[in-house]
Amino acid sequence: MSALAGPKIAKIIAPKKNHQKISIYTFGEPRVGDHHFNSVLEASVPEIYRIIHKHDIVAQIPPPGMTPFTKSQYFHHKTEIWYNNDMTEGVPFMICSKKNECDETFVKTHANINDHLTYFNLQNSIE
């Protein structure tokens, strides 16, 4: 699922009464909303997870802080599941329940697109 679908999903499920049964898992999701958006999303869908592969650069954009074009700040919703490895079956991962907790482990000089293009040994394409 594309992270760009997040706002649409939030609009669809917000008025529903059974939204507590929905779980969302994203892979390599960038920051997609401000504090208000994330608060509504987390209240609407308690089971929402961002799965991040090692040094996936897409998960780090837009950078934290005010963006010059929108004059907004973008944030991740919680909970992140971070794999600091090749994501093969049985490897350990870190669960970060606080916003930006796993971001502290991210080393900007190691950021790369290859980690975004491979999740659980499945190669994605930008073609």
Model-derived features: positions:
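Non-catalytic, mobile gating and regulatory segments of ester bond hydrolases
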Residues: 3-127
